[in-house]
UniProtKB/Swiss-Prot annotation:
Biological processes per GO annotation: carbohydrate metabolic process; cell wall organization
Name under which the protein is recorded: Glucan endo-1,3-beta-glucosidase A1
Annotated Pfam families: Glyco_hydro_16
EC category name: hydrolase
GO MF entries: glucan endo-1,3-beta-D-glucosidase activity
Compartment(s) of residence: Secreted
Any single Gene Ontology cellular-component annotation: extracellular region
Length: 682
């Protein structure tokens, strides 16, 4: 459960990006990069990586701006950052003198400067409010390379006029993707979005409606930021939308009558028949990773749209018989909704979207025959007849398949007996008393991080304030209850902002911390829109910097509206916004949910890997080859080599589920915890 911040989505990635490629790369551990290993080479020369990476980099912003550049080419390109990092220092010019950045004053690693690592590249980032000169130097040889980071302050202003730079008539793709760059404000191209952002509102309506919808933090309307609309940064930035019907988008000034209306047209095709034909080719060869991507067939000569996807039938030929791909026991394929899961050795498949829709498959090691069918009447379950397109897959026998030898299920204790063979119980709370045991737990209270008004809702836009009241946190009948209630309250940090709900959050900081081991929570979770129960861990000391450079382990998080699944995640990398995460989902067997019974949520944390389980069943693993901390590039286990403490809470709203808010019937909501147990191996 992270202290999240505003996340920008790139329009090209969201709408036109190579979604399949990104999924495939991420699935095989390419994103993010492996951590830096031990170094020993000294720097004999440095040159700028590209013209965009120095010597002069100019940025503008309201009060401050963020800069980043790729590491220079070391030793004529023969040495990498991994080789030379221990020999590279950073100076800042103070007056006319070069001063080590750690001695210059005002520069705090992982707060306003640091390292980044992404996609095989490394570099530096800085957040600055004035033009600054930076010098990289070799500690051994005195080689230097200088950068000038030029800052131009943007003064906030209000909007008097807007003119489109794209549109205002825009046609959405077959998948519903569309977008436009920010307009020209006040008839002056020098007036940026940042200068007027506080004065700008966004409204949406169907083209055949007269009622505008304010989509700012209004998940109840169905418009959820970073889900079906958002902002991108490429080309100066703008807005993106995913639509299923034609809509109008209105940008409007809060302080004047200036507004601009766009029309995004979604052309739903007219089908004269439902005969399908190949989109492009019918023979596909697996790549080095064993992955294959195919576009879905055309229907009556046109690409399918979202509402038609459920009508398709996908089959594989097994020993001369056609078997539904979804019948995993016969097809030997597992559907993966979130991209390739490199913790599973199963053949996997799923959908991708990149202007059109398609399917991905991985790892394909053998040749096989696939066919896709569509009902002749266009209705799900209708007669298909011979309306199939047949595909030939040429497998790659050398494609990697994950090793799952250490992914066996684990034994769990019973509600009355914590004993587990091979494990020592080192801490527990069975909640058998009548009140919360404050020798084991602390209350967290309030609505803001560090009393900063900008961090309302705990930095996540959550809607609850936390209390130490027994109406929100109480022990009854051998269970801990954390209860969210309708209980509006404002705080001195911003008297005009109200937290609509109260709830509970407790932790073991300074009372229990562990470095490696196993944690079991047995809990029953609440359902409801915007209800967000979590069991998680944070570092006792932020040795590697503020979130997420020092790490976070989410044992379990759940979305109340989706009672059939929970997730486990780690957060790592650098301080926001260069943080990274890796996680997986557990799907309950048919007939079970996280709300209809108690389930045991476990994390097993070892020096070089972390694994997640539900009721003893393995569902996800991450290794130290996938995590890192930019503050300790030569430490293979950072940041997960420091003590962490436990946290339990029940949040409402927030960014985890796209800003969704509860219905009236969803509150009160209660998370019940039967026990928390901490083990070490014998």
């Amino acid at each position: 459960m992270k202290p999240s911040h505003f996340t920008e989505k790139r329009f090209m990635k969201k709408v036109l990006g190579l979604f399949l490629v990104v999924v495939m790369l991420a699935s095989v551990g390419v994103l993010p990069t492996s951590k830096v290993q031990a170094a020993g080479t000294t720097v004999t020369s440095m040159e700028y990586f590209s013209p965009a990476d120095g010597p002069v980099i100019s940025k503008s912003g309201v009060g401050k701006a963020s800069y980043g550049f790729v590491m220079p080419k070391f030793n004529g390109g023969s040495a990498t950052w991994n080789d030379v990092y221990s020999d590279v220092g950073v100076n800042v010019k103070v007056g006319n003198n070069w001063v080590d950045i750690d001695q210059a004053g005002g520069y705090i690693y992982n707060q306003n400067w640091g390292h980044w690592s992404d996609g095989g590249f490394n570099g530096y980032w800085f957040t600055l409010s004035a033009t600054t000169e930076i010098q990289l130097y070799s500690k051994a040889n005195g080689v230097k390379l200088e950068y000038q980071l030029v800052f131009q302050n943007i003064n906030k202003t209000t909007i008097t006029a807007m003119n489109p730079t794209q549109g205002p008539q825009i046609t959405a793709s077959f998948t519903g993707g569309a977008g436009f760059t920010y307009p020209t404000f006040n008839n002056d191209s020098a007036v940026t979005y940042e200068a007027v952002a506080d004065d700008l509102k966004v409204y949406v309506k169907p083209v055949n409606s007269s009622s505008w919808i304010d989509i700012d933090n209004n998940a109840a309307s169905g418009w959820i930021y970073d889900h079906n609309f958002g902002q991108f940064t490429d080309g100066g930035g703008g807005y993106w939308f995913n639509v299923t019907e034609s809509i109008n988008v209105k940008l409007e000034s809060k302080t004047s009558s200036a507004n601009l209306v766009y029309t995004i047209t979604f052309n739903e095709p007219t089908r004269n028949s439902y005969v399908i034909t190949p989109y492009e080719g019918t023979t596909f060869t697996a790549d080095a990773n064993g992955s294959i991507g195919i576009p879905l067939p055309k229907i009556d000569g046109g690409a399918p749209i979202a509402k038609e996807l459920g009508n398709f039938v996908y089959q594989i030929n097994i020993n001369g018989q056609w078997v539904d791909l979804s019948n995993s026991s016969q097809s030997k394929f597992a559907y993966s909704a979130n991209g390739y899961n490199n913790m599973s050795d199963a053949n996997q498949w799923g959908y991708w979207a990149d202007y059109i829709y398609g399917l991905w498959f991985q790892p394909i090691q053998e040749n096989m025959q696939i066919r896709i069918g569509y009902p002749l009447n266009g209705q799900a379950g209708g007669n298909i007849g011979n309306n199939f397109v047949n595909y030939t897959f040429i497998g790659n026998p050398n494609a990697p398949r994950p090793d799952v030898s250490d992914q066996e299920d684990i034994s769990i204790g019973t509600p009355t007996d914590p004993a587990i063979a091979g494990m020592n119980l080192i801490w527990q709370d069975e909640f058998n008393g009548t009140t919360l045991d404050t020798s084991k737990w602390n209350y967290e209270t309030g609505y803001y991080l560090n009393n900063d008004p900008a961090t309302w809702g705990w930095g996540n836009a959550e809607l609850q304030h936390y209390t130490n009241s027994t109406q929100n946190v109480y022990v009854q009948d051998g269970k801990l209850n954390i209860k969210a209630m309708n209980d509006s309250k404002s705080f001195p940090q911003d008297p005009n902002r109200y937290a609509q709900y109260s709830s509970g959050k407790i932790n073991t900081k300074d009372k229990l911390s562990l470095k490696y081991g196993r944690v079991d929570f047995r809990a029953k979770l609440p359902t409801g829109d915007g209800v967000w129960p979590a069991l998680w861990m944070l570092p006792k000391d932020s040795v590697y910097g503020t979130w997420a450079a020092s790490g976070e382990i989410d044992v379990m998080e759940a979305r109340g509206r989706l009672p059939g699944s929970v997730s486990g995640t780690i957060h790592f990398g650098g301080q926001w916004p260069v943080n990274q995460s890796s996680g997986g989902d557990y799907h309950f067997p048919e007939g079970q949910t996280f709300a209809n019974d108690y389930h045991v949520y476990s994390v097993v944390w070892e020096e070089d890997n972390i694994k997640w389980y539900v009721d003893g069943k393995f569902f996800y693993k991450v290794t130290n080859q996938q995590w890192y901390s930019t503050a300790a590039p030569n430490n293979p286990n950072a940041p997960f080599d420091e003590p962490f403490y436990l946290i339990m809470n029940l949040a409402v709203g927030g960014n985890f589920d796209g800003g969704r808010t509860p219905n009236a019937s969803d509150i009160p909501a209660t998370m019940q915890v039967d026990y928390v147990r901490v083990y070490k191996e014998q």
